[in-house]
């Protein structure tokens, strides 16, 4: 998936704004309050259209609170009026096809339209049908990591058992501002128990652990790094040998904010890749 261009109208601080993105990397620079996060949130809503066709995932729409507010002098008071329609239009490529799609919210009581996004939803609908039939299409990783992920944790709306991890669950909460570490820990728990039962570590679990361990080793310089899921505490533990050659073991949640945030993002990316495409085994 590649977003080449996005055009937004009456979305938060923007009455009208258009942005183009480089195919490799786009860096957005601006003063505080100029709308950098707003632009990224608009992109996440556009990308969220892809998720609307997947079972148990749901899409991401435009909220009435996203509407631009205009100020009008009314005698001795200043009145705020939300502006509609709120519109987000994007163009790019998905599964080898060049597509354009648009989402709109026409009123505070309305719902985000999807009628102008059929090019996008038809692709995701076909992917969902193939998954349902047991086929193995390669699903793209989608994730959004906002500035509040370190402090905000997603509150689970339902009790998801260990057996629930079908492929599309790799898209659950992938565009939320708050992280869902509980779901990630449930995946580690399931795979750890499964590995213990079979007597061998699942290749995809080994690959995810290796990604986290390599990240921790590269930013700290510590050696013999291992990642283990603690079945007693239900936490991810980092085991390593420090500069004094002493063996240490700490829960990932107890690390400094910088380490924790970095490792959490790497872990989230890696485990979602394993959930979305488990048939790739160690190549996830």
Residue ranges and their predicted role:
Residues 93, 170-284:
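Extended helical coiled-coil dimerization/tether regions that scaffold
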Residues 1-183, 200-204, 214-217, 221:
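P-loop NTPase switch/coupling surface
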């Amino acid at each position: 998936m590649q977003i080449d261009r996005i055009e937004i109208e009456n979305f938060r601080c923007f009455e009208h704004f258009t942005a183009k993105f480089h195919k490799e990397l786009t860096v957005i620079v601006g003063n505080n309050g100029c709308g950098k996060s707003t632009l990224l949130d608009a992109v996440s809503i556009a990308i969220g259209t892809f998720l609307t066709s997947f079972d148990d995932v749901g899409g991401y729409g435009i909220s009435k609170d996203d509407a631009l507010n205009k100020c009008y002098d009314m005698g001795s008071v200043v009145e705020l009026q939300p502006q509609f329609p709120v519109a987000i239009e994007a163009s790019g490529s998905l599964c080898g096809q060049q597509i354009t799609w648009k989402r709109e919210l026409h009123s505070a009581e309305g719902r985000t339209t999807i009628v102008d996004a059929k090019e996008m939803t038809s692709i995701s609908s076909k992917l969902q049908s193939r998954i349902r039939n047991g086929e193995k299409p390669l699903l793209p990783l989608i994730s959004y990591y906002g500035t509040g992920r370190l402090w905000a944790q997603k509150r689970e709306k339902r009790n998801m058992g260990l057996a629930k991890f079908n492929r599309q669950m790799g898209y659950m909460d992938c565009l939320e501002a708050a992280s869902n570490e509980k779901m990630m820990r449930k995946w580690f728990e399931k795979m750890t128990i499964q590995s213990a039962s079979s007597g061998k570590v699942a290749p995809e679990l080994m690959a995810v652990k290796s990604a986290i361990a390599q990240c921790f080793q590269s930013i700290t310089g510590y050696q013999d790094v291992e990642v283990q899921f603690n079945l007693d505490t239900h936490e991810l533990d980092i085991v390593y040998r420090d500069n004094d050659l002493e063996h240490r073991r700490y829960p990932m949640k107890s690390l400094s904010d910088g380490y924790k945030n970095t490792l959490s993002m790497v872990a989230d990316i890696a485990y979602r890749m394993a959930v979305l495409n488990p048939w790739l085994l160690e190549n996830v």
